[in-house]
Amino acid sequence: MATSCFPPFSASSSSLCSSQFTPLLSCPRNTQICRKKRPVMASMHSENQKESNVCNRRSILFVGFSVLPLLNLRARALEGLSTDSQAQPQKEETEQTIQGSAGNPFVSLLNGLGVVGSGVLGSLYALARNEKAVSDATIESMKNKLKDKEDAFVSMKKQFESELLSEREDRNKLIRREGEERQALVNQLKSAKTTVISLGQELQNEKKLAEDLKFEIKGLQNDLMNTKEDKKKLQEELKEKLDLIQVLEEKITLLTTEIKDKEVSLRSNTSKLAEKESEVNSLSDMYQQSQDQLMNLTSEIKELKDEIQKRERELELKCVSEDNLNVQLNSLLLERDESKKELHAIQKEYSEFKSNSDEKVASDATLGEQEKRLHQLEEQLGTALSEASKNEVLIADLTREKENLRRMVDAELDNVNKLKQEIEVTQESLENSRSEVSDITVQLEQLRDLSSKLEREVSKLQMELEETRASLQRNIDETKHSSELLAAELTTTKELLKKTNEEMHTMSDELVAVSENRDSLQTELVNVYKKREHTRNELKQEKTIVRTLEEELKFLESQITREKELRKSLEDELEKATESLDEINRNVLALAEELELATSRNSSLEDEREVHRQSVSEQKQISQEAQENLEDAHSLVMKLGKERESLEKRAKKLEDEMAAAKGEILRLRSQINSVKAPVEDEEKVVAGEKEKVNVQQ
């Protein structure tokens, strides 16, 4: 591509290009970097000038590749100029001036290439400059880090050297101290040699003292064992007394709970009694109401009886009217039969009238009479129908009255059933009240028994409390005496310990004096060391024994303080027990008063119960009478119902007969109408013939 595009290039052109691009490379954008790299660049130019020419050629080729799209753009612009030559003369002039000034197209191309290459190289140079700046910054940071590490390494060296020096000094000091300690140990050995002989004699004396102390310790141990046994006995006695007190407290709590339960039961019984009184009052009210209702029912029954009598009378009158109606119906039926016979006769006469037209005039008179008779029959039928409608109205009224009476009787029966139920409820409530009163009496008897038992138990508890008080006071006196003895023994043991300590101090002083006077016994050091260790062990054992004795004494003192505290607590508990007993006595007195009140209430309740029994017996008698009256009324009502049913049957029969009569009347009317139509036609024919005869005349 490069050879085809640029064939005439030679060394002169390459020199021109190099002369044109040198100022671009020598632009003062990064003078420091150029200064740093001047010797490197000089060496490179001096070594290989051919490589620089090759680089220039390569740069020209790259610029040519980058300019190719610009040439295409210029060709497109020239095509646009050929199309718009008439509209843009000024642009052509400018192009001509540019072509005239250029003279040679290769020079213009080179200028364009130089401009484009300068832009590309400038951008590449800027990128390289930024990369160099970043690399310089990283190098400087690395140099700073290296300097810091070197400083840290130097400081570590100095610290290590100082530590080594200090360790050497410490080792020297330790060596000196060890030498001094060795010398001190040698001196101690020398002094120990002098003290060993004196220790032998002192050990013998100390053994004697230790044996004496052992005998004294054994005696003290025996005394301590005796005191421990006495203390155990006292503790057992205290436990027994505490158990007794707990048992008494439990009994007291049980008694208090029982008393509270009895109080609650008394309250509940009183509330139940109040409820029963209210129930009795309500029952008395119900009884009075039932009496009033019975009076009202008796009055209503009387009224019903009067109404029944009235209705019976009305029914008798209605039966009479029904008999009259039956008679009238029979008469109407007879008249109907006669009218039927007359109709048959009229039909026969009509047939004869047809056969005998000459006898029409005579038949007209008979027809008029028959018509009059028919009108009379129609009037009679109308009256019969009106009477039948009246009878129907009466029957409907009677049925309504019958239904009303049935409703009244049903309501009365419901009221009677309700009264029976109320009476049964009252009887059940009275029986329940009786059973509850009997239960209350049983409970009161139980309460009396419990109160007597409580009084007995309270008296027993008082006796037991007095005995426990006496025994506790004895135990307290014994514990006081034993504590005083223990305190005296403790004082004696403390004095003995002080004496032994003083003797030990004197012996130690004498041992020091003997150790200063005797320095010639070096050969017996080993034996003396053994003896000294043995004596040390014995002394340690004696010290441990003394410490145990002191600890036991402290423990005894603490036990004495505890026993004092227990004594105080027992005294407080005794005071509380006495207070609780006083409260129990008060509660017992209050319960006795409440029992007396309950007995009085029971007596009053029994009186009231007897009164209620009498009232209930009276109510039963009244209810029996009311039941008998109700049964009588029920029997009367049943009789009335049967009579009503018979009347209803009769009314139904009358209705059926009336319906049959209506049907027959309608048939008669239809027959009469059928007879009237041909008669009227014949009359019209006769009238027409008469008119014709008159016209002919």
From Swiss-Prot:
Keywords assigned: Chloroplast, Coiled coil, DNA-binding, Membrane, Nucleus, Plastid, Starch biosynthesis, Thylakoid, Transit peptide, Transmembrane, Transmembrane helix
Main localisation: plastid
One of the protein's GO biological processes: starch biosynthetic process
Taxonomic superkingdom: Eukaryota
MF GO annotations: DNA binding
Record topology, Stromal segments: 128-697
Transmembrane segments annotated in the record for this chain: 107-127
Transit peptide interval: 1-41, 42-79
Membrane topology recorded in Swiss-Prot or TrEMBL: Single-pass membrane protein
Ranges of the Lumenal, thylakoid topological domain: 80-106
Disulphide bridges: none
UniProt-annotated location(s): Plastid, Chloroplast; Plastid, Chloroplast thylakoid membrane; Plastid, Chloroplast stroma, Chloroplast nucleoid; Nucleus
Polar residues bias: start-end ranges: 616-627
Residue stretches in coiled coil: 203-671
GO cellular component: chloroplast nucleoid; chloroplast thylakoid membrane; nuclear matrix
PTM: Phosphorylated in vitro by human casein kinase II. Predicted to be translocated into the thylakoid by the Tat system.
Basic and acidic residues bias locations: 604-615
Region Disordered, annotated ranges: 81-100, 599-629
Domain comment in the entry: The C-terminal part (439-697) is necessary for DNA-binding.
Subunit structure: Interacts with MAF1. Interacts with PTST2; the interaction is essential for the initiation of starch granules biosynthesis in leaf chloroplasts, for the correct location of the process in the stromal spaces between the thylakoid membranes, and for the association of PTST2 with the thylakoid membranes.
Record function comment: Required for the initiation of starch granules biosynthesis in leaf chloroplasts. Anchored to the thylakoid membranes with its C-terminus facing into the stroma where it is essential for localizing PTST2 and SS4 to the stromal spaces between the thylakoid membranes in order to begin starch granule formation. Associated with leaf chloroplastic nucleoids in vivo. Binds to various chloroplastic double-stranded DNA fragments without particular sequence specificity in vitro.
Name of this chain's protein: MAR-binding filament-like protein 1
Lineage: Eukaryota, Viridiplantae, Streptophyta, Embryophyta, Tracheophyta
Gene name of the record: MFP1
